[in-house]
């Protein structure tokens, strides 16, 4: 029997505001526990919430970027449930009237095709605090610094049919919120986290299967593993004659499996009702147009421009526009190296990315600036150094040994381009290797590489490879 996987994702993006959604308390990460929780966050009597305008602006910005309808009137509701890190006994969220309506996001599949994933809604809500179970023996501690931090919950349609599609959607969404500068996307710190709703059904049927919700998955790799495990688990149950239970599950990355957390609640379990302390949110057209004017060039637009303007392949353009910072760095390199777009792409995706990954740095933390890398690429183009020597120059620059010109001068790496000097070295190599010379002239063409290698070795890699090839061809005839 063939089964079809059905996946919908709920993503919580922590908005990059300086203060909380309903109070003036700071949202800075890493402060001492409970040092950033004010009377409103603590749920003390007699205090009233005041909506953060910047959080609304960021939500509208996201809605415009996904081509969604912005609700002129939305309502905040109380979502009632008990949890130790929820001081009020309810969470302020949105239910029937969210700020952002239907939208969509286009993802690329592995075969190069594209697929549109529907976005049902995006609504504003406050985050809860944090329960700390490992720091206290036999007890749990509560840190309310995170309570009241603004979240944008982005709910997709159940349009994904594999774990890989879900990861592609999640990565696209992650890049988008970072491009918009509404969320820093830091998954380790919980700024961007995902709940996956997973079910299976017989292929060809319209009715959805019973879904399980996997909570708070905080890496792309874990999302793929958690979904794949859950799909196999549900298929095993159904093929064994059992029934899948609707429940909330947690993914255990150490064991690579999901485990039951609690039975899945329905909306009526939360007893939603409009928050009497908050007026309905009215958004007029002028506010929306003002936000529209702040939209940056979006990832798909930038990718298309890189392909048409710089002549890059779809793959290269996709890699270079994966983050706003990467795209900006690349364009600065192209400008600094005189417009050699393909050479710049190769170096940014190659040596630079490898060095960043090795040192676990973001591109904004690169010790080699875009201008400095561009200057080095110019030295390749004007034949001052070869591409091979450039790798040594780049390593020295990365280690703080100065600019490309300074490193080339200090280490004596300038390429030998004097024809007479190269010819003299070729003559010596030929004289030192009479056996190989005779074999080459007898038709053993593969030995050409041997002679190139000997010349490059004799010059310490500093001879111009193109000149060496041309001169050797003439000399070896």
Swiss-Prot record:
Keywords: ATP-binding, Ligase, Nucleotide-binding, Protein biosynthesis. The keyword Methyltransferase does not apply. Its EC number is 6.3.5.-. It holds the Pfam family GatB_N. GO terms for biological process: glutaminyl-tRNAGln biosynthesis via transamidation; translation. GO terms for molecular function: asparaginyl-tRNA synthase (glutamine-hydrolyzing) activity; ATP binding; glutaminyl-tRNA synthase (glutamine-hydrolyzing) activity. InterPro entries: Asn/Gln-tRNA_amidoTrfase_suB/E, Asn/Gln-tRNA_Trfase_suB/E_cat, Asn/Gln_amidotransferase, Asn/Gln_tRNA_amidoTrase-B-like, GatB, GatB_C_1, GatB_Yqey_C_2, Gln-tRNA_amidoTrfase_suB_CS. It catalyses: L-glutamyl-tRNA(Gln) + L-glutamine + ATP + H2O = L-glutaminyl-tRNA(Gln) + L-glutamate + ADP + phosphate + H(+); L-aspartyl-tRNA(Asn) + L-glutamine + ATP + H2O = L-asparaginyl-tRNA(Asn) + L-glutamate + ADP + phosphate + 2 H(+). The keyword ATP-binding applies. Heterotrimer of A, B and C subunits. Allows the formation of correctly charged Asn-tRNA(Asn) or Gln-tRNA(Gln) through the transamidation of misacylated Asp-tRNA(Asn) or Glu-tRNA(Gln) in organisms which lack either or both of asparaginyl-tRNA or glutaminyl-tRNA synthetases. The reaction takes place in the presence of glutamine and ATP through an activated phospho-Asp-tRNA(Asn) or phospho-Glu-tRNA(Gln). HAMAP family: GatB (MF_00121). Belongs to the GatB/GatE family. GatB subfamily. This is Aspartyl/glutamyl-tRNA(Asn/Gln) amidotransferase subunit B. It comes from Thioalkalivibrio sulfidiphilus (strain HL-EbGR7). The gene is gatB.
């Amino acid at each position: 029997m063939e089964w079809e996987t059905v996946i919908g994702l709920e993503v919580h993006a922590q908005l990059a505001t300086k203060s909380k959604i309903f109070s003036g308390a700071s949202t800075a990460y890493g402060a001492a526990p409970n040092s950033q929780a004010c009377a409103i966050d603590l749920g003390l009597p007699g205090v009233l919430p005041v909506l953060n305008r910047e959080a609304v602006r960021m939500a509208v910005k996201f809605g415009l970027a996904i081509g969604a309808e912005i609700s002129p009137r939305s309502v905040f509701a109380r979502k009632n449930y008990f949890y130790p890190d929820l001081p009020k006994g309810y969470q302020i969220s949105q239910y029937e009237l969210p700020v952002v309506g239907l939208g969509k996001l286009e993802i690329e599949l592995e075969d190069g095709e594209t697929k549109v994933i529907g976005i049902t809604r995006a609504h504003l809500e406050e985050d809860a605090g944090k329960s700390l179970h490992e720091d206290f023996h036999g007890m749990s501690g509560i840190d309310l610094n995170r309570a009241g931090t603004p979240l944008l919950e982005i709910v997709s349609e159940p349009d994904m049919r594999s774990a890989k599609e879900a990861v592609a959607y999640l990565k696209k969404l992650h890049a988008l919120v970072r491009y918009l500068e509404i969320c820093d996307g830091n998954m380790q710190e919980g700024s961007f986290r995902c709940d996956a709703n997973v079910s299976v059904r017989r292929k060809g049927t319209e009715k959805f299967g019973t879904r399980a919700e996997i909570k708070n998955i905080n890496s792309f790799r874990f999302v793929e593993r958690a979904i794949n495990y859950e799909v196999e688990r549900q298929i095993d149950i159904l093929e064994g004659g059992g029934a899948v239970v609707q429940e909330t599950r947690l993914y255990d990355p150490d064991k690579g499996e999901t485990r039951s957390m609690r039975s899945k609640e329905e909306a009526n379990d939360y007893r939603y009702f409009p928050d009497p302390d908050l007026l309905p949110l009215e958004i007029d057209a002028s506010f929306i147009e003002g936000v529209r004017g702040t939209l940056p060039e979006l990832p798909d637009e930038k990718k298309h421009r890189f392909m048409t303007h710089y002549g890059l392949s779809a793959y290269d353009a996709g890699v270079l526009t994966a983050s706003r910072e990467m795209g900006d760095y690349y364009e600065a390199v192209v400008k600094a190296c005189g417009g050699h777009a393909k050479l710049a792409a190769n170096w940014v995706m190659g040596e630079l990315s490898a060095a960043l990954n090795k040192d676990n740095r973001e591109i904004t933390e690169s010790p080699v600036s875009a201008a400095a890398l561009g200057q080095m690429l110019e030295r390749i183009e004007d034949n001052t150094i070869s591409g091979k020597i450039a790798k040594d120059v780049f390593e020295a620059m990365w280690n703080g040994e100065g600019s490309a010109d300074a490193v080339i001068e200090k280490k004596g790496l300038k390429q030998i381009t004097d024809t007479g000097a190269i010819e003299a070295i070729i003559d010596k190599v030929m004289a030192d290797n009479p056996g190989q010379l005779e074999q080459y002239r007898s038709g053993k063409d593969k030995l050409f590489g041997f002679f190139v290698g000997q010349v490059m070795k004799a010059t310490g890699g500093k001879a111009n490879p193109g000149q060496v090839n041309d001169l050797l061809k003439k000399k070896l005839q």
